[in-house]
Structures are given as C-alpha cells and as structure tokens.
Amino acid sequence: MMKINLNADLGESFGAWKMGEDDALLQVVRSANIACGFHAGDPLVMRNTVRMALAAGVSLGAHPAYPDLQGFGRRPMKMAPAELEAAVIYQLGALAGIAAAEGGRLSHVKPHGALSNQACEDAELAATVVRAVRAFDRELILLAPALSELHAVGERAGLRVAAEIFADRAYTDAATLAARTQPGAVIHDHDEIIAHVLRMLDAGGIVAQSGKVMKTVMHSVCVHGDTPGAVQSARRLAETLAAKGWELVGLPEMGE
C-alpha cells in the first residue's frame, strides 16, 4: 500500500487568543507541527497541544519561527546567522522539554512562515536552520517543501528530509508557493483542495497554477488549520486518500 503523511501546524493560540480547531484536526492528521512561542503558542498551549497529540497517537514536531508574535511569523526578517541558529535551538529545546515531561519526544522540525519561505530560496539561510537542527538532534526529520533549497541543503547535510506539498496553496512555475496576496494563492473550496492534492500525487510532482508539472518525491501533505472549514477539508482529504489506496502514517513511518 502507498504511504503518505498528513501534517498540520498546531498550537498556534496564545494567552486568551485562540487559533484553529486543534483537537479536531488531531483526529485526522498523523503529524503535528507545534508552535514554539516565537510566532504563536505559549508554555501552556504548547503543553496542552503535546498532550492532545500524544493522546491521538500523532507524531510531534517543532514549528520554529522568527521572533514575530504580532506578525504571526509571516514577516521577513534579517537575523545574524549565530542569532538565528540560537533562536531555532532555543525553540526546539523548549518544545522537546515539554514533550519529555509528557512522556514523548520530537520526531521532526518544520520551519514556519517567513523563516521557511526565505530558507526555501536562500541556501545560506537554509544552512543556518539546518545547522541548528543538527546541533540539537541530528536524528530529527526535517520537514521541508519539496524542491526547495531547504530540502536540498538538509539532504546534503545528512539529515533525514521529508518532502512536503501543500493542500490549500497554489504553486508558481518555480515550485514555490504563490504569494498570499495573489488571486487564487490560497484554495478554500473543499473539492478543489482534494483535486489539487490528487493532481500532484497522480502526476508525481508539484503542479503549478499554469499546469506545469515539476517531478519530485512527496512524503507529506500539509493541511492548514487556520483557514475556514479546515477540519472538514482535512477529513474529506483523508477519506479520499484512504479510498484511493493511500495509507496515512506518521512521519517516522514514511521511511519504513
């Protein structure tokens, strides 16, 4: 049976502010990327999310970001390499500590927002992120967008890298995500989200808005939890994939 992973960015509430339906999404996805306090999340949210993920049998991942709570980590920043490397290690350590206290451990790392977007195009920035991951725990899986610099740099550094595609985001001919400001960049229709994923899996690569196909391996599909109807879309996608013969597994199982 063909294997595929579904992942979601979770734990992005903080304080009195609530984001997403994490408890419901955890019944659908197989891997959770948990905010580590820099773009969202706080110690209590992180702990509660870890507990829910462990109870659901979902693999735990860190979702480190630039220090940008107000901008939700989506604003590009320029940080000195040493500063950024330390910031990523700090976030990994925070979540790993909480996971250990709850009897779990991290399986993967997925950079968030602008940090991910910039690292996907800038090999030097990607190398800084990869150094941080290797320094913290070189057994961690790096979950990186397929065909990105981050993916390539991670592989060259000897990390185990999982290639990610996005269910609800349109692609450019360069295999990058279309800017959120562009029409059609974020896909909201449930049927189109499912069709978009199936097109890519059937084609064996990323399918751009233009129809261009860029061949690549694909290990994981990201379903965003902060879009309207996210849970319904994720549930329908999971059901459709299962009906078409795909086994939904955690990231650590993708290489088995």
UniProtKB/Swiss-Prot annotation:
Keywords: ATP-binding, Hydrolase, Nucleotide-binding. GO terms for biological process: carbohydrate metabolic process. It comes from the Bacteria. Pfam families: LamB_YcsF (PF03746). GO terms for molecular function: 5-oxoprolinase (ATP-hydrolyzing) activity; ATP binding. Coiled coil: none annotated. It catalyses: 5-oxo-L-proline + ATP + 2 H2O = L-glutamate + ADP + phosphate + H(+). The keyword Hydrolase applies. Its EC number is 3.5.2.9. The keyword Nucleotide-binding applies. Catalyzes the cleavage of 5-oxoproline to form L-glutamate coupled to the hydrolysis of ATP to ADP and inorganic phosphate. Belongs to the LamB/PxpA family. Forms a complex composed of PxpA, PxpB and PxpC. NCBIfam families: PRK05406.1-3, PRK05406.1-5. This is 5-oxoprolinase subunit A. It comes from Azoarcus sp. (strain BH72).
